Structures are given as structure tokens and as C-alpha cells.
């Protein structure tokens, strides 16, 4: 009987403790994410955008939103036109979470007051739809989580105009395979003793393509593999957004954590969007960039491997893949 009483007392204490859980988000200005915001101005509308990291989201919302696969995207819009504009949150993510949906997904058991505060806080900090003439508004769109990089489209509409801004954010905290190259001039890294040839005509480009290897190889070049069937001509700031916009994800660097996670998904199924992929070789090195697009299962995914070629076309970089 005495043990039973102890159990009841402990249970009541636990319920009391959980019921006293307070909602204590860090003030937004103290989190520091706005320092990373990027800005664009077009047709009288200025947009500032930043994608919060897992740590910033936890501080700003007192909850591990990334664990719930929710990623807050902060947006500030300044309307310097003479007409009211309308912001469309689904331009950021067609499947974005409504503020009260986020509060419901992150609610705490036996913490009614804290949950009410969450609902109010998430709603008050969401991005307004209306952008009055001559004013600035800001807030969050609660998007689905993306790691490594995110393409953000911000669209606003008025009676006489439609304005859109495109941003590409590399999100800190994710180690992608291409991070192994470091910073600096990639041509000097990949071709330190080779002159980069600039192709001036389509004929020169066609001839160069015909001279390229037909397939990838293994590390020592003794076996061939997948065909090389793609040539991309474009600046990185144009190519990278195009792939993110089309649903391609960066690939995690090969490491113990990513390998274990891949194994778990391989056994139990499900889609691991960032699974590391094997190395294939062109120009004597493994892929410079690896991207992938997964289906509903890790066993069904498309891989894209790209190598920076030792040529340019009228000064524009060339990638082969």
C-alpha cells in the first residue's frame, strides 16, 4: 500500500511539473537571424528573406521545429508603390503550415496555458497577407523543412502589377558533399596545371562535346559505368536555383551519421532526401556536385552527378554530367 501511495504521489508531481511547462521563446531581435537576410528590390517592392537554421528556429519558437519537419522562413516586404499588394504564402511553399497547425503539431501534453500562448505567438508572428501602400510588413511562412539549400519564391500581386523575387539560401548546419571543395577559385582547384579553353562558337562546342568520354569510370579508370548525357552551360547563380526549383536536393557528405541513416531507411523504407551516393569518376576525380530527387522510397531515387569542365563558352562555365 505504501509503495502504491508513493507511485500516486510521484505521478501527481509529474503531472504538476508538466502542467507548469512555460512557453519562453527568445526575442526575435536577440536570435540574430536577420543579419543573414538577403534583399532584392523590383518594381517598388523590396523583399528581405532568410531561412532559419534548426538552432535559430528552436530559440525563436521555443520548440524543435526541425524535428517536426517545419522550417520558418522570415520575410520582410516594403511597399513603395501607391497601391495595396497581396502576398501569397504558397509561393514560398505550396504545402506550407498554417500558424495554428504549427501550434497543434508542437503542443505540449498537460500544458494548456502554454499551448494557448503558442497559438497566439505563432499567429502573431506569421507573415501578413496584405501589404499596404507605403508600409513595411514582416513575419514567417512555416514551410516544410529543407536541408542544405532552399529556393524561395516571394510573389506579391496588386491591381496593376505582379512582382516576384527569387532567393537561393544555403542553410548552415548541413554538410553537403560539395563542401569538401572549400572556398576559392574552383578552376585552380580542379585544373591547377591546365589552361581553361574558351569556346567561341557552336561548332567549337560541338567538337569539344564529341571529344568527351562517353561514360563515367571507377576510381582507377578500369571500368566504365553510367553514360555522360548532359551538358550545362551557365553561371552557378543561375544553374543552382534551377535545380532547387525543380525539386532536386543536395547530397549529404559521406560519414558515419549519413551512412547509418541511409541503412535505416533502406531497411524500413521511406524517403531519405539527402542520402549520400557513391563516387563515379570523370577527368580523374569524383563528382564535384551530387544532387538527387527521391520518390516515396529510398530505393527509388534519381541521381545527378556534375563535373566542372576545363572549358567555358564565351566566358560562361560548362558542366558535364
Show where each model-derived region lies.
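A cross-kingdom signal targeting lumenal/periplasmic-facing segments of multi-pass membrane
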Residues: 254-321
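Low-complexity, acidic Ser/Thr/Pro/Gly-rich terminal tails and inter-domain linkers that flank the onset
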Residues: 27-67, 209-210
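Surface-exposed edge beta-strand/loop patches
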Residues: 21, 28, 34, 95, ...
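The feature marks short-to-medium sequence segments in extracytoplasmic or secretory-pathway proteins
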Residues: 80-132, 137
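Terminal, regulation- and interaction-focused segments at domain boundaries
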Residues: 212-242
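Short, solvent-exposed beta-strand/turn "edge" segments of beta-rich domains on protein surfaces
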Residues: 57-74, 81-84, 130-132, 220-221
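Short, hydrophobic/aromatic beta-strand segments
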Residues: 83-91, 152-154, 240-244
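C-terminal motif of bacterial Sec signal peptides marking the signal peptidase cleavage site
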Residues: 17-19
Amino acid at each position: 500500500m505504501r509503495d502504491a501511495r508513493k507511485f500516486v504521489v510521484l505521478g501527481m508531481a509529474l503531472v504538476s511539473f508538466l502542467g507548469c511547462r512555460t512557453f519562453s521563446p527568445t526575442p526575435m531581435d536577440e536570435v540574430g537571424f536577420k543579419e543573414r537576410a538577403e534583399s532584392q528590390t523590383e518594381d517598388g517592392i523590396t523583399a528581405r528573406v532568410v531561412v532559419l537554421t534548426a538552432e535559430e528556429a528552436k530559440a525563436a519558437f521555443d520548440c524543435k521545429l526541425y524535428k517536426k519537419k517545419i522550417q520558418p522562413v522570415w520575410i520582410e516586404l516594403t511597399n513603395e508603390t501607391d497601391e495595396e499588394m497581396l502576398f501569397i504564402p504558397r509561393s514560398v511553399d505550396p504545402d506550407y503550415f498554417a500558424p495554428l497547425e504549427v501550434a497543434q503539431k508542437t503542443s505540449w501534453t498537460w500544458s494548456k496555458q502554454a499551448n494557448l500562448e503558442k497559438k497566439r505567438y505563432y499567429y502573431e508572428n506569421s507573415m501578413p497577407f496584405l501589404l499596404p501602400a507605403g508600409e513595411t510588413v514582416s513575419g514567417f511562412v512555416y514551410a516544410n523543412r529543407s536541408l542544405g539549400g532552399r529556393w524561395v519564391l516571394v510573389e506579391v500581386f496588386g491591381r496593376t502589377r505582379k512582382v516576384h523575387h527569387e532567393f537561393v539560401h544555403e542553410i548552415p548546419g548541413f554538410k553537403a558533399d560539395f563542401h569538401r571543395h572549400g572556398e576559392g577559385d574552383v578552376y585552380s582547384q580542379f585544373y591547377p596545371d591546365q589552361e581553361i579553353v574558351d569556346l567561341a562558337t557552336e561548332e567549337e562546342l560541338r567538337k569539344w562535346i564529341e571529344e568527351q568520354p562517353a561514360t563515367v569510370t571507377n576510381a582507377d579508370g578500369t571500368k566504365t559505368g553510367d553514360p555522360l548525357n548532359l551538358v550545362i552551360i551557365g553561371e552557378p547563380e543561375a544553374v543552382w536555383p534551377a535545380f532547387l526549383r525543380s525539386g532536386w536536393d543536395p547530397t549529404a557528405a559521406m560519414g558515419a551519421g549519413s551512412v547509418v541513416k541511409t541503412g535505416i531507411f533502406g531497411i524500413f523504407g521511406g524517403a531519405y532526401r539527402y542520402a549520400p551516393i557513391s563516387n563515379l569518376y570523370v577527368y580523374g576525380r569524383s563528382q564535384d556536385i551530387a544532387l538527387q530527387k527521391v520518390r516515396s522510397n529510398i530505393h527509388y531515387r534519381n541521381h545527378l552527378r556534375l563535373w566542372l569542365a576545363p572549358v567555358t563558352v564565351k566566358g560562361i562555365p560548362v558542366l558535364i554530367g
